[in-house]
């Protein structure tokens, strides 16, 4: 029951919430090797353009994933 794009690639990783940045990067790159992963503090204002090669990781003050990582 994962959310996938038209090429059957995973586009969301809800299972990574509360995991470490390192663990999240490893899992995402296994699923989507071309991903450009960007780590940002939760609450950071970001641009709204959609990029199929980008995954933003919003982290809490302990560098754990605070929001579901998504392609975009």
UniProtKB/Swiss-Prot annotation:
Keywords, comma-separated and alphabetical: Protease inhibitor, Serine protease inhibitor
Matching Gene3D superfamilies: Trypsin Inhibitor V, subunit A
Keyword Iron-sulfur: no
Keyword Coiled coil: no
Pfam families: potato_inhibit
Site features described as Reactive bond, chain residue numbers: 48-49
InterPro entries (alphabetical): Prot_inh_pot1 (IPR000864), Prot_inh_pot1_sf (IPR036354)
GO BP field: response to wounding
Domain of life per record: Eukaryota
Entry's Gene Ontology molecular function annotations: serine-type endopeptidase inhibitor activity
Family: Belongs to the protease inhibitor I13 (potato type I serine protease inhibitor) family.
Function, as annotated: Inhibits both subtilisin and chymotrypsin.
Protein name (Swiss-Prot/TrEMBL): Subtilisin-chymotrypsin inhibitor-2B
Organism: Hordeum vulgare (Barley)
Taxonomy of the source species: Eukaryota, Viridiplantae, Streptophyta, Embryophyta, Tracheophyta
């Amino acid at each position: 029951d994962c959310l996938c794009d038209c090429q059957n690639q995973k586009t969301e990783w809800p299972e990574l919430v509360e995991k470490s940045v390192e663990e999240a990067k490893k899992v995402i790159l296994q699923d989507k090797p071309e991903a450009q992963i960007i780590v940002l503090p939760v609450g950071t204002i970001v641009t709204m353009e959609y990029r199929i090669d980008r995954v933003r990781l919003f982290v809490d003050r302990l560098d754990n994933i605070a929001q579901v990582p998504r392609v975009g």
